[in-house]
Amino acid sequence: MKGEKYTRFERARIVGARALQIFMGAPVLIRTDSIDPLEIALEEMRLGVIPITVKRDRKR
């Protein structure tokens, strides 16, 4: 996922979904002192380790 370009809407959806996963007890994929799921998800996004992909429709 590193280097892939996401729209601002895709980034918001990915980070939000990942923050919810973390809040619900999913394992954190990075070492961090933070306990805020949103901060953790943002850091995971920055590092490119979020295990979520985006499937786009082809443009017509």
From Swiss-Prot:
The lineage of its organism: Archaea, Methanobacteriati, Methanobacteriota, Stenosarchaea group, Methanomicrobia. GO terms for cellular component: cytoplasm; DNA-directed RNA polymerase complex. One of its GO terms (molecular function) is DNA-directed RNA polymerase activity. This is DNA-directed RNA polymerase subunit Rpo6. Belongs to the archaeal Rpo6/eukaryotic RPB6 RNA polymerase subunit family. It is found in: Cytoplasm. Its EC number is 2.7.7.6. It is an enzyme of class 2 (transferase). PANTHER family: DNA-DIRECTED RNA POLYMERASE SUBUNIT K, DNA-DIRECTED RNA POLYMERASES I, II, AND III SUBUNIT RPABC2. The gene is rpo6.
